[in-house]
Amino acid sequence: MNARRRHLRAAACLTLVGLLACLPLAAAFGSVNEDDMVLRLSAAERALPPDRLPDFDASCAALMDEDGTLWFGRNADDAAQIASLTKIMTAIVAADWLDASTMIEVTPEAASVGESSAGLAQGDSMTFDDALKALLTASGNDAASAIAQAAGARMLAQEGSGGDAHACEAAFVEAMNAKAAELGLENSFFANPHGLDFDAFAQGQYSCAADVATMLRAAMQIDLVRANIGFSQADITVQRDGAPVTLALENTDALLGSYPGACATKTGYTLAAGPCAASAVNRGDGHKYYAVVLGSSSKPQRFVDSAALYDWAYANRSSLRAPIADEDIAGLAWGERVAFTVAWFMEGW
């Protein structure tokens, strides 16, 4: 092993030792398990006791950092319903095709989706910027379909064809799955732009906590999406029957404005998915984290679960580092960095 690799392994060792040596005692042990993963190795493999893991009750979870490293996972790769977290991918794909000022028209099909709504009516029109707020703040299924149909129409036009609202939305969903492949999401399949998963909308869609974290990380790198995913409430203007109408939008989130550094949250719920949330925290300390919880025991609990993951990360991620250039470590593939980390941890435990 050359000197550079020895230094890199030492750096990885120091980082993980800093993470694991300082873990606080958990308040209760009922919501941790030996299959929970720290840097892709289970608590059992690391011989970690429950009091050295985050305590929360979601059935699936992922905690990812700005580099895409999965620091913690619980059933993070298991297929699950993600409900309205699907709208994160809708925003990502639409931003490839629509500008902030692009006008979005609400079709009869979009207005009639049902369930979670931004209060849009057939014939309403608004800018894509406002439509994103309706999508990400109010979690409007009407907004999701309207956006998908507008972007899908452009996709079909580029191919020299066209179609009705259903054809446009189908083209958009195809693009969602293409984007999933581009982002390396290996455990995701999208069937609609809003995430409904029952009755006519039960079309075999699925994702997983780790893939949703990757989606949110990608979304936060898009200026227009990032600017519209962090509102607790927002007002938008739609043109309705030839006159401007203001719609007040409310977010069901409980992290924004209350949890330190919370800068983005998307919530979701269906009976199949249970309460879920994807969120981002940035405290300006050089680290950004993305937490995803699926299948929490209640809607309020999904925010408690998210906070538990962030608390664990901020309490335990050490800044200790061997005297080696950051770019040397960053230049390694994620898997190679973790391989060094795991090897040193297992040797020294």
Question: Model-found features: residue ranges?
Answer:
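Alpha-helix C-terminal capping segments
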Residues: 93-98, 283
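N-terminal Sec-pathway targeting helices
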Residues: 2-14
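Beta-lactamase-like hydrolase cores
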Residues: 14-15, 22, 26-85, 96, ...
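Short, well-structured active-site flanking segments
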Residues: 96-110, 224-231
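Conserved catalytic neighborhood of penicillin-recognizing serine enzymes
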Residues: 113-154, 246-264
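Penicillin-recognizing serine hydrolase domain
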Residues: 29-58, 152-348
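Residue-level preference for non-acidic, small/hydrophobic
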Residues: 68, 85-94, 104, 135, ...
